[in-house]
Amino acid sequence: MNVLEVKNLTKSYKKHIPVLNDFSISIPAGRIVGLLGPNGCGKSTLIKLISGLLQPDSGEILVDGNEIGEKTKAIISYLPERTYFNSWMKIEELVNYFEEFYADFDKTRALTLLHDLGIEPKAKLKSLSKGTKEKVQLILVMSRKAKLYLLDEPIAGVDPAAREYILSSIVSTYNPEASIIITTHLISDVEQVLDDFVFLSFGGEILMSGNAEEARNENGKSLDMLFREVFRC
């Protein structure tokens, strides 16, 4: 069974212009998929639809065979593009909150990742840089034993020195029966961890997709170079 099935999905905002138009995709278990495209092409909208934060105009979304609802929310771990925690909270309070709220949260894993990145659990969020706040949020999201991880621009605010560690941590510790969707514009940084990729254009049109390694071998180019060619960057 595929972890994610999206069929004929359409979503419009103002003036009834579709952000996603008859969009379909299937993602099997154990895959890390890069959803790659320019700003405004519908990447974040798709992530919010899968997470249940938005409702589609038409189409179907199934996560582990279930329609979006309470069952899917329990098995999806979602990292939004922007930090949403209260700035007055301590990191250790957030860790305890996640432990209480999510039955699949691994507190030991979260504390280990915080330690490895030199982040003090007793620090308050308001004392941290934007990049460190994003590291904390990513650690909490990836410390759940979910079936589907939705990561919206997970390393956009993270310093280059920490990106490799964070990405390697994602690969080495997530459930092999789960899948991860990563949206990003930092293709050269993330392509090393991607199994599959989707180049998404405006209106949710898929311009190119497939196995990342096969695409590199067949074209003799990195995904980053292919992306620049496809979108004429």
What is the role of each PLM region?
Residues 81-136:
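ABC-family P-loop ATPase nucleotide-binding domains
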Residues 51:
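Helix-to-loop junction immediately C-terminal to a conserved catalytic motif
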Residues 160-162:
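Helix N-cap at the start of a conserved alpha-helix in ABC-type nucleotide-binding domains
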Residues 197-211:
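H-loop (His-switch) and adjacent beta-strand-loop-beta switch element
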Residues 149-153:
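Catalytic Walker B motif of ABC-type/P-loop ATPase nucleotide-binding domains
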Residues 1-6, 10-22, 29:
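A short, flexible loop at the N-terminus of ABC-type nucleotide-binding domains that lies
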Residues 59-72:
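Conserved ABC transporter NBD signature motif
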Residues 38-42:
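Walker A (P-loop) phosphate-binding loop of ABC-type ATPase nucleotide-binding domains
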